[in-house]
Amino acid sequence: MPSIVTVGTFDSDNVADVTKILREFDGEVAPGLPRLRRRQVFHYSDLYVHMQDWDAADADEAYRLATADPRCARLNDSLAAYFGDHAPTPDWDGPVDRPTAERFYVWPAEDVENLELTYSAVIVNTQRQEHNAEVARLFAESDATDIPLTMGTLRRQIYLWRGIYLHIQDFAEPDAIKVISAVWTEGDPRFLQLVDDLTRLIPPYDPEGNSLATRFYHWAAEESK
């Protein structure tokens, strides 16, 4: 079940207005979109991150499902008053015409059952496209160990859009900060080495804050039944 992820500028003062729009849509329209399984929206610094999970074979099919239905198009029109376009980061070295973030790493390769019942955490940094292979290699080596099991990670996806790096993890535990903090407290040297290796590849988006985005909206298909 691929995630369609869009990113742009956002003023967090508008959280209530955006939440109202989404609640109305997902309460009235989403139940008629049986292949839409989950929607989550996060804010971080001056950004929004809008994630949609669709029951689709791949990201291309999911994108068609998310954009072809005129009801979804009307929702996007309503959100456009609050979700703005974001220019590429200064050192971005990739395309600027993609409508959604590109996923370049996923673990595990198999679908996760009942994914809509999990809780997502989004870490925001920056990255150049040329580093995709190295970042993917580092995570693949780590995910081949027991670290994901110890951390409680059920799925890991990494996306890139105009230089904005998004590390998305799905957990059974609702408190992402608690889960992530526990890993730091335990101090597994393999995890700390991974962080050190990644630091040179994924500089912070906001050097003044932490990298964890705040989820302010969530809807899952089961909740509509």
Predicted regions and their residues:
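Accessory, usually C-terminal, subdomains that scaffold auxiliary metal cofactors
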Residues: 186-193
